Amino acid sequence: MISLFCSLLFSQSIVTQESYDSRFTPPEIGLPENMPYVKSLIWGKEGAFRKLNIGPETRIEELKLRRKMLQAHQWLGIITLAGLAYQYDVGKKLYDGDDSDYWESHYDKHKAMGYFTYMTYMSTASMSFFSPPARKYDNNMSSIKFHRRMAALHFTAMMAQPFLAKKAVESGKRYNELMDAHLKAGTVAFFALSLDALGITFFK
């Protein structure tokens, strides 16, 4: 009798567990339609990560990983924006001013912050770029589409900044011209990233 009771109890626990699993475990989710081209090169059916067997084994696990990566993307973006605000403010004062004391005390800080923000920016971008695809994509205008368009703008400006600064130092004759372009690239990067942050926060 005890053995029968234990068997019934055990079988009931299995049924209960199966019922729980079927109710609370979502069915497998396929790859989304209209996946962005670059994302499909990485995560598509014939994407690089599929061929190299990189990443989670199921789409559900992929979506969990995507959420974690995008959360890191957001926090790194905030850090980058704060760093860019400081760098832009100091850089503009260095460019506009003629105070040698300010230059001597802040030039190295501006340069160091430039390396820091470039590193955090690229880390931020990589979190989004290499994250698994979303559950779905649509053609309607949204905060995500606005984010992608602004990202193309501030990414280009961030790539141009160090190149222009390096060329300005190397080319004495075009120093003022290249430094002016460097400042403009920094302005575009800072304000585009600021608008991007506002858009992703308030635009639905």
Give each language-model segment a name.
Residues 100-109, 141, 173-181:
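Extracellular loop and loop/strand-boundary signature of outer-membrane beta-barrel proteins
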Residues 66-95, 109-132, 145-169, 179-203:
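Hydrophobic alpha-helical membrane-anchor/signal-helix detector
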